[in-house]
Amino acid sequence: MFAGLPSLSHEQQQKAVERIQELMSQGMSSGQAIAQVADELRATHTGERIVARFEDEDE
């Protein structure tokens, strides 16, 4: 379970996707780009936060 994940509006999600695509177009791997954008969001987000739980479906 992860607590304190930023709750993003559709517009904020779209901007995050565009930022990831920009970083990838500059040669960054998708994993690195996602991690960097996630770090940026956590550092700058001032809105609500959600609690999320991720489970492996393979298990």
UniProtKB/Swiss-Prot annotation:
Superkingdom of source: Bacteria
One Pfam family it belongs to: UPF0181
Family: Belongs to the UPF0181 family.
Name recorded for this polypeptide: UPF0181 protein CKO_01169
Organism: Citrobacter koseri (strain ATCC BAA-895 / CDC 4225-83 / SGSC4696)
